[in-house]
């Protein structure tokens, strides 16, 4: 399994309100560039758009501590989506055959390993940035 080495580090801050300020600032810079829905272009998917609004909806379903952990990895996740050429781990959803889940693995400049999950609709080809989280090491 190949890992993408991001040039970004964790976002600064120890509380949710501090971290969300930096994450929203980065999100708003992406949003201002696009006309309709915010997206980033991915090198792995040959320049296809990966929409990032679903991430925020998914994030608000988590508790405050988990939100803070995930938001700290936000800038590294965006860097991975834009620049990674490493092949992801692809998971086929048994309940919905039209959905593929791609898991990209990366490492921040601080050395923290993380996982980015992208959902792809096979019918339309639409790709959505779903989630970012710490990679749990299981032995």
Regions found by a protein language model. Name each.
Residues 1-139:
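Ribonuclease/tRNase effector modules and their secretory precursors
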């Amino acid at each position: 399994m190949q890992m993408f080495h991001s040039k970004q580090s964790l976002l600064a801050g120890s509380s949710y309100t501090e971290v969300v300020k930096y994450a929203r600032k980065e999100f708003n810079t992406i949003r201002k560039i696009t006309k309709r829905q915010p997206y980033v272009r991915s090198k792995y998917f040959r320049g296809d758009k990966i929409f990032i609004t679903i991430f925020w909806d998914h994030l608000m379903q988590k508790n405050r501590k988990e939100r803070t952990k995930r938001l700290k990895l936000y800038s590294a996740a965006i860097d991975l989506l834009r620049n990674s050429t490493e092949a992801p781990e692809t998971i086929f959803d048994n309940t919905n055959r039209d959905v593929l889940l791609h898991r990209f693995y990366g490492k921040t400049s601080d050395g923290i390993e993380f996982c980015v999950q992208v959902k792809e609709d096979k019918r339309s080809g639409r790709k959505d940035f779903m989630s970012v989280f710490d990679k749990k090491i299981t032995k």
